[in-house]
Curated annotation (Swiss-Prot):
The keyword Iron-sulfur does not apply. InterPro entries: Ribosomal_bL32 (IPR002677), Ribosomal_bL32_bact (IPR044957), Ribosomal_zn-bd (IPR011332). SUPFAM superfamilies: Zn-binding ribosomal proteins (SSF57829). One of its GO terms (cellular component) is large ribosomal subunit. It comes from Nitratiruptor sp. (strain SB155-2). This is Large ribosomal subunit protein bL32. Keywords: Ribonucleoprotein, Ribosomal protein. GO terms for molecular function: structural constituent of ribosome. One of its GO terms (biological process) is translation.
Length: 49
């Protein structure tokens, strides 16, 4: 079993964790001017984008 040779400092661990974040989904504007999430069907037009 792997055992760390040295203790990882709080700062070093926090720097590594800066990339563990949620990416925000940007809404897309449809042809009819309504905003919707990408990869979802527009209920009014039935368009999938």
């Amino acid at each position: 079993m792997a055992v760390p040779k040295r203790r990882v400092s709080k700062t070093r661990a926090a720097k590594r964790r800066t990339h563990y974040k949620i990416k925000l989904v940007k809404p897309v504007k449809d042809k009819d001017g309504t905003w919707k999430l990408p990869h979802h069907v527009n209920p009014t037009t039935g368009e999938y984008k």
